[in-house]
């Protein structure tokens, strides 16, 4: 599939099924804990500065945000999880919204699960990965902020993350940096393969 990634726009924000786009376009969902770099990932992948708003305040995305890419596919930005300052009730509401989308959306082709290369995956990261494996949803692990770690230590951090996730070697694992654009081509290859 040839994609003009410059031709991208935010299409709509949805709180539930009735608001989802009603067509056949394939979707790739992006999930990860708050401030893992999801907005930066979207902006880097689509060669845009601020299509997805980056925020110093975690927990800003509270709806599913659908991004139209060249009228051929969509990114779906899922609310960041694991943000402490959001009430338990809010978190449960998000949880249900995310679960409904991930388990019932026929357009969904795969989930890009973002983790921070600098740290061990959180319990939420592990739970998300297990959830995706349980429902047999294709998953691409993208380890963000690779530029913050010396290249010589990447392998060590990658191994630690894979071990904690109980990573399935048949899944893609991509080291990514929105600063250096490391892993961008690899991420696109993995995504397009799932469409």
UniProtKB/Swiss-Prot annotation:
GO MF annotation list: GTP binding; metal ion binding
Domain of life: Bacteria
The UniProt record lists the keyword Metal-binding: yes
Any single GO BP term: division septum assembly
Family, as annotated: Belongs to the TRAFAC class TrmE-Era-EngA-EngB-Septin-like GTPase superfamily. EngB GTPase family.
Protein role: Necessary for normal cell division and for the maintenance of normal septation.
UniProt-listed NCBIfam families: GTPase_YsxC (TIGR03598)
Protein's UniProt name: Probable GTP-binding protein EngB
Primary gene name: engB
């Amino acid at each position: 599939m040839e994609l003009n990634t410059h031709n991208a726009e935010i299409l709509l924000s949805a709180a539930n099924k009735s608001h989802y786009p009603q067509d056949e376009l394939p979707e790739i969902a992006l999930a990860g804990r708050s401030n893992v770099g999801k907005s930066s990932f979207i902006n880097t992948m689509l060669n845009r500065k601020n299509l997805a708003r980056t925020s110093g305040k975690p927990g800003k995305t509270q709806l599913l945000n659908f991004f139209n890419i060249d009228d051929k596919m969509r990114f779906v930005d899922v609310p960041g999880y694991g943000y402490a300052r959001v009430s338990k009730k809010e978190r449960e509401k998000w949880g249900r919204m995310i679960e409904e989308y991930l388990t019932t959306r026929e357009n969904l082709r795969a989930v890009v699960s973002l983790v921070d290369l600098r740290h061990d995956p959180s319990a939420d990261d592990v739970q998300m990965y297990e959830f995706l494996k349980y429902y047999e949803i294709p998953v691409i692990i993208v380890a963000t902020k690779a530029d913050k770690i010396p290249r010589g230590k990447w392998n060590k951090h990658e191994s630690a993350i894979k071990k904690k996730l109980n990573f399935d070697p048949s899944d893609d694992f991509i080291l990514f940096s929105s600063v250096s654009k490391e892993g961008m081509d690899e991420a696109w290859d993995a995504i397009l393969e799932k469409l």
